Amino acid sequence: MADDEFIGRERECAQLASPIAEALRGHGSLILVAGEAGVGKTTLARQALSRSGLTVLEGFATPGGASAFAPLVEVLRAHLRSARDGPLVEGPLADHLALLLPELGRSAPQGDPAALFEAIRLALATIAAQQPTAIFLDDLQWADDATLELLPALARTLSEQPLLILAAYRSDELPRAHPIRRMRSELRRSGHLKQVSVEPFDAEATAALVDRILGPVAPTLRRAVFDRTDGIPLYVTELSAALAASGRLQSGASGLDLLDGADVPLPESVRDAVLLRATGLSEDARAAAMAAAVAGQLFDPELVRAVAGLDTWPDELLRRGLVTEEPAGRMAFRHALVRDAFYSDIPWTTRIKLHRLVAQHLAAGRATPAVIAEHWVLGREPGRAREALLAAADGYCAVHAYRDGARAFRRALELWPEGEDEGSRLDVLQRLGSCAELAGDLGDAATVWREVADGRQRDGDDRGLGDAQRRLAAVLELQGRWQEALASRERAASAFTAANSPADAAAERLAAAAHLRSAGSFRAALSLLETAAQQALAAQRVDLQARILGHEGNARARMGEGQRGVELVRAGLAMALEHGLTGPAAEIYQRLADALEHAGDYSGASATYDEAYSFCSANGLEPTAQLCLACLTTVLRQSGDWDRAAKLCRQVIESPDASAHAHAVATGQLGFILGLRGQTRQARPLLLEAATIARRIELAAMELLSGWGLAIVDSVEGAPQSAAGHCWALLDRWKQTEERHFVISPLRWATTFFAESGDASGTRACAAALARIAADVGQDEPMSALSHALGETALIDGSVEQASDQFARALVLLQGYDAPFERAESQRRAAAVLAAAGRREEAVEHLVAAYRTSRRLGAKPLVNQLAAALSALGERPEVRLGKRTATQLENGGLTRREVEIVRMVATGRTNREIARELFLSPRTVEMHVSSILMKLNGRSRADAARRASELGLLTPRAD
């Protein structure tokens, strides 16, 4: 064996060698080191790093309470103790780092979590930039939640830094809800989960370790040690040392063995081995060991000496290897299991007394409240423990360690005497609710806010009840539990009304109405807005009055009262601008554009969305600006500017400021455009994502539009049954709303889809829905869609003449609208009717006009349908459309070179073989194949060959 320090760890050392080498080359990573207690994780990490060439810094977690980010703070302090270079972080971030390291000077206000994370990340990067560095974090099973939540985020930043982080934890101490499991899941999700598992020694390695400690040992003793310890290195070490100290070993022919006839029972556990080894400690040393065990794994020897009532520190513990010296004048037990052994041997009453003494000394010093609280808890002092836990919770929250803060608040509440100071208890519950929200524990937060609301109601505190119901509503909305959220909003409004706070009541009803508007429940929204308007007026809140006007006008426009709705929104906007209310004005600007869109003024809506975007951007209101852009894409798509719409969709999707609403709209519209263009492989995941978000936030318009998009995708991919399912689902969802605008085009398309599929019931159901919308709204756009639908039903009934009249009327009614895709679809269906009536020239004119429109839009599936319809009428495409266009249509959009290549792909040739035969570069062939896959909507070469066969491209045509 080259080095006895690495007994039995060849595999683990090999696993660590690669990330160490990569870190030296500037490519760091996070490596988890897992194994049961005493298996040697710490020894392995330290030995591997000691010869790595990396500067090593250590931090560790301890049981019994700690400050937020404690292991990382320990690392930073270790660096500061030895560093001679400049500051870790400069500029504003230095103040954020001072929240964790007060010795750096003035700290920032609480700030935001992102700034604190960036300060920590930059500090670690600064350390690594000075010298390639390894950070060893030990015993993370005891770490605070904040540290464990930060590590996955750090892992994503290490690949371009000379920084390796080894993080060790006990794998045998992880209950199902342990935060390490969340950390591992997040690392796995992001592709950064790397772990070295440390296993117990086998019999051979155990024997080698025993021989190293005791010298050559008889085989019988080796077997006895292995059988008793199961190869746990710490147990092997302690047991071997205990046997050596017992004086009951003798030398024999095969090595050391137990004395003949000696009754020396082997210890049953590490605890027993440690206590056996400690036999013979002086009274002072035993007192110091007990006090140190109570103080913690890492302790201040001066504090322990004072608690134990000793004049001097007994060096005996150091000599026996039970404790070790640590930086900053501290000491630590050699292993946590050694500390556990001493702690478990302390009588219960003595233990309580020692915890109280430790708490008193810590409270007189500068210890963190979390550590002090733990000693008061174990010292059976609930009042003092509660006070310290509340201070600890506040400290956690100050550095955004909200899970840790919530845990401290819960523990403080568990210690609250029943019936004592109920008002203060409810205040603490409120702080817990806020903490749970910020930690993302929404289920817990909802439970807490319900309890607060019940308590405030019992106390007759209407104001407090309103606040609690408001917070509960916000949490329920985040969970997507909208009906419960709306009920909480109403309860909050009622409580605020009872508390004579009309402004708050109006704000709650406005919030509820805003959601109902998005969900397509316009009448319910208007009912709430009516009451809210009265309360806003009573409170003299101009901002609320302006916003209520904007919402009311928008809701009325969505119900078909276009002119009145637009006038109300304009009045709200004028009010907001007159009083310099920038935020409300931005919101109402967006509502105005939406109202114009619903009133059928697409050019006005487009211009207003552009104006609203500029206004929001100029005033730093980026989330509203992104929403305006997202909504603008709907108008652009409707009016045929698909390229700009797609570009803006991508801009919104990439924006960190986009709300869920904006993201749903942009994702759905981009997927919809790609679907209309035949790029179904890219379209489907976008539409599914949009549908998921829209359902979660109850955005009815996008639920309907994404469902339509998925129907189009299925239709293009040749899955009519699935497409029909989406159409029926669209109808069902519409019936649950009062939506009268965004559903018009989907129903228009679904009517034709059902008709061409021979589904008369689906056709009639869509026509009936459009008839209801047209009656409610009375605008030309829904009337055009209804005429289109009636044309389809007339065809089903066999009345070609009536169908022709209806399609003609549909086209006339569209003349005032810039809706090219809908016009092209109606022209295609009108042409089919005209052809059936023998009016061939008129049919061809419609087809050519529709073809040119769809070609401009890039609507490839519709282009192909129109070209096929022309061919069916005996038209030569090269005459009507131009020779180049006709050839591309015949070839499924492929160029001659692409047709040549797809034929070779179908024979199984590789890109390199094709390149050789056609005297092209492999890269050029690769580009052609990618283009073929996109044009034929294929995922693989086999898909392309199959589609080419269906189009008849694999057999050369005779000229």
Language-model features: locations:
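Helix-turn-helix DNA-binding segment
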Residues: 805, 871, 881-936, 943-959
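P-loop NTPase Walker A phosphate-binding motif
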Residues: 36-66
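Extended alpha-helical scaffolding segments used for macromolecular assembly and cargo binding
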Residues: 28-30, 44-48, 132, 311-313, ...
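Short secondary-structure boundary elements
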Residues: 204-416, 774
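Conserved Walker-type P-loop NTP-binding/catalytic site
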Residues: 70-134, 185-192, 201-211, 215, ...
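Short coil/turn linkers that connect adjacent helices within long alpha-helical scaffolds
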Residues: 365-367, 379, 399-400, 418-421, ...
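Tandem amphipathic alpha-helical repeat scaffolds
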Residues: 38, 341, 374, 391-398, ...
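Alpha-helical sensor/transducer elements of the RecA-like P-loop NTPase core
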Residues: 43, 99, 159-220, 224, ...
